[in-house]
């Protein structure tokens, strides 16, 4: 078993993808958000340090083989207004990841971030990251993968995955997974038949834009979004990229038409669209926290496929 340390662990999606292979076990994790930590601890038994990573002392972290880091992407994402390293809140958090890498020298590093990381600041941000990893002894491969093409999950979600090896042979052996057919549909992810809690449904008295929704949402085969002035139908029959602000209502929330009415996705359905298994526990938290956690998370089957290839490359 290869041992994992997980930074910015969130609810544990990256950890879960690695553990599902049967080749890796998480020995230590860190997460700052107290609500995400509640979800993490409902599903994982390993040690979780709930603190700002800047307060973590390297000597307090046990030895491990693989470092996972989904360092916060708000400063690199379109949703986060493209600030990058100047962003005091999260731009410097890559360097906190680097601090642990330099101190602990794991065999493998796995980083996940938004696709925009590559183009941010004319490629300079990514260049800094790439060169920092390389100059500290890692051979790097990276690729942007879409969940619908590489995870058999009907969500349009592109993310960059960066894998680094200290061993040049392992690096040469490693390839990202090949595309695979999408066999799961939106209907596999959502519950169209049951009447759910009233709070998920849009009604005339609760929703100022109810009548255009009613007029334009004609199919139960797809997902819609309210885009400030009009209803957008997703023609590709996959869910649009889930975001951390889904639970706040209004703009961009994925909506479905069911026989019981028009409603937004439930937190569980959002986790389904991230490829979490049915037995993944969602604790009794306010839905806004769970929506945020799902939107900030990763597509677990994509992670699992990359993790399998990492393990095979080290044999």
UniProtKB/Swiss-Prot annotation:
Gene3D superfamilies: DNA Methylase, subunit A, domain 2 (3.90.120.10), Vaccinia Virus protein VP39 (3.40.50.150). Residues 2-315 form the SAM-dependent MTase C5-type domain. Its EC number is 2.1.1.37. Keywords: DNA-binding, Methyltransferase, Plasmid, Restriction system, S-adenosyl-L-methionine, Transferase. Disulfide bonds: none annotated. GO terms for molecular function: DNA (cytosine-5-)-methyltransferase activity; DNA binding. The active site is at residue 73. It is an enzyme of class 2 (transferase). PROSITE patterns: C5_MTASE_1, C5_MTASE_2, SAM_MT_C5. InterPro entries: C5-MTase, C5_DNA_meth_AS, C5_MeTfrase, C5_meth_CS, SAM-dependent_MTases_sf. GO terms for biological process: DNA restriction-modification system; methylation. It catalyses: a 2'-deoxycytidine in DNA + S-adenosyl-L-methionine = a 5-methyl-2'-deoxycytidine in DNA + S-adenosyl-L-homocysteine + H(+). A methylase that recognizes the double-stranded sequence 5'-GCNGC-3', methylates C-? on both strands, and protects the DNA from cleavage by the Bsp6I endonuclease. NCBIfam families: dcm. Belongs to the class I-like SAM-binding methyltransferase superfamily. C5-methyltransferase family. This is Type II methyltransferase M.Bsp6I. It comes from Bacillus sp. (strain RFL6).
């Amino acid at each position: 078993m290869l041992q994992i340390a997980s930074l910015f662990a969130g609810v544990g999606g990256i950890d879960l993808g690695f553990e599902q292979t049967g080749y890796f076990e998480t020995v230590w994790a860190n997460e700052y958000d107290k609500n995400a930590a509640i979800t993490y601890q409902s599903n994982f038994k390993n040690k979780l340090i709930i603190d700002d990573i800047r307060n973590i002392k390297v000597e307090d972290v046990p030895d491990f083989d693989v470092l996972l880091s989904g360092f916060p992407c708000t400063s690199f994402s379109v949703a986060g207004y493209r600030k990058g390293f100047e962003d005091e809140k999260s731009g410097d958090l890559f360097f906190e990841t680097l601090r642990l890498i330099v101190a602990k020298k794991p065999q493998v590093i796995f980083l996940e971030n938004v696709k925009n990381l590559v183009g941010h600041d004319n490629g300079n941000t990514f260049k800094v990251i790439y060169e920092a990893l390389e100059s500290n002894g890692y051979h790097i491969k990276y690729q942007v993968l879409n969940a619908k093409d590489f995870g058999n999950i009907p969500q349009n979600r592109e993310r960059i995955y960066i894998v680094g090896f200290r061993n040049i042979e392992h690096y040469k052996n490693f390839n990202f997974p090949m595309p695979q057919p999408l066999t799961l549909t939106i209907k596999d992810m959502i519950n169209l038949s049951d009447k759910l809690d009233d709070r998920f449904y849009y009604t005339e008295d609760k929703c100022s834009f109810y009548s255009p929704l009613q007029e334009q949402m004609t199919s139960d085969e797809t997902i819609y979004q309210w885009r400030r002035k009009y209803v957008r139908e997703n023609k590709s029959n996959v869910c649009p990229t889930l975001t951390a602000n889904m639970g706040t209502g209004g703009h961009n929330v994925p909506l479905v038409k069911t026989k019981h009415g028009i409603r937004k996705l439930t937190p569980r359905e959002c986790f389904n669209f991230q490829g979490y298994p049915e037995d993944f526990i969602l604790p009794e938290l306010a839905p806004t926290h769970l929506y945020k956690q799902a939107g900030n998370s990763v597509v677990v089957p994509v992670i699992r496929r990359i993790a399998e290839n990492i393990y095979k490359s080290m044999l």
